[in-house]
Amino acid sequence: MAATAREDGASGQERGQRGCEHYDRGCLLKAPCCDKLYTCRLCHDNNEDHQLDRFKVKEVQCINCEKIQHAQQTCEECSTLFGEYYCDICHLFDKDKKQYHCENCGICRIGPKEDFFHCLKCNLCLAMNLQGRHKCIENVSRQNCPICLEDIHTSRVVAHVLPCGHLLHRTCYEEMLKEGYRCPLCMHSALDMTRYWRQLDDEVAQTPMPSEYQNMTVDILCNDCNGRSTVQFHILGMKCKICESYNTAQAGGRRISLDQQ
């Protein structure tokens, strides 16, 4: 249920109607940029040609008694609870989802807080099981998702960390896997492909090349380890000699061994 904008005193969201499709809350935000009332900044941004700065919100309106007051967790007039969770920095009101405000991220995150740590180099809160087990890329969270080109850092969609360190929205990652397996930025495998590589080993072994190709070699570059090697050409794939990945690309022309020329 999406909220609609209204000017002060104008008809709009019904009295007592709680929250919107984005948040469960008992108040409307008074946008400091245009003085209109919206349930949340996302509803505002979807309807206006400018963005609401969450940090500049000063006033809210209670959905029950309609009193406009300074931003706080409980209505000073009728004691309506505006949100089980309230951040007086982001002015975020919502039901309790174990949220916490991360000073380094500068915004609120869904917790529990003890399940996450802030990586200073990546500049993002990550799950504890990734601590010391992910590849850091400086300020990677400030880059847009390479699939949808939308913001990742402030997105309400969970970010997925690829083995290469790049980030995608979780939903974009799941869609990407329907079409391919490689990071759209660096071409590194986006998940553990070991089982598939072993299947490909069997297929290559069972598919001999025609005699004129059996002694043909090619230089390859591995997208997974960045190593270079010279291997036998095969139409099904060419396996990196260093890491045994088939995520490779030709780095030079094909050639026939001298003893076969």
Curated annotation (Swiss-Prot):
Residues at which Zn(2+) 2 binds: C33, C34, H44, H50
EC number of this enzyme: 2.3.2.27
Sites bearing Phosphoserine, chain numbering: S257
Coiled-coil residue spans: none
UniProt zinc finger (RING-type) residues: 145-189
Binding site for Zn(2+) 4: C87, C90, H101, C108
Residues that coordinate or bind Zn(2+) 1: C20, H22, C40, C43
GO terms, biological process: error-free translesion synthesis; positive regulation of proteasomal ubiquitin-dependent protein catabolic process; positive regulation of protein ubiquitination; protein autoubiquitination; protein ubiquitination; rescue of stalled ribosome; ubiquitin-dependent protein catabolic process
Subcellular location, record wording: Nucleus; Nucleus speckle; Cytoplasm
Pathway in which the depicted protein is active: Protein modification; protein ubiquitination
Post-translational modification: Subject to ubiquitination and proteasomal degradation. Interaction with PLAGL2 or KAT5 enhances protein stability.
Residue ranges covered by zinc fingers (CTCHY-type): 82-144
Alphabetical list of PANTHER family matching this protein: RING FINGER AND CHY ZINC FINGER DOMAIN-CONTAINING PROTEIN 1 (PTHR21319:SF53)
Quaternary structure note: Monomer and homodimer. Interacts with AR, MDM2, KAT5, PLAG1, PLAGL2, COPE, UBE2D2 and GORAB/NTKLBP1.
Function recorded in the entry: E3 ubiquitin-protein ligase that mediates ubiquitination of target proteins, including p53/TP53, TP73, HDAC1 and CDKN1B. Mediates ubiquitination and degradation of p53/TP53; preferentially acts on tetrameric p53/TP53. Catalyzes monoubiquitinates the translesion DNA polymerase POLH. Involved in the ribosome-associated quality control (RQC) pathway, which mediates the extraction of incompletely synthesized nascent chains from stalled ribosomes: RCHY1 acts downstream of NEMF and recognizes CAT tails associated with stalled nascent chains, leading to their ubiquitination and degradation.
Record's protein name: RING finger and CHY zinc finger domain-containing protein 1
Gene for this chain: RCHY1
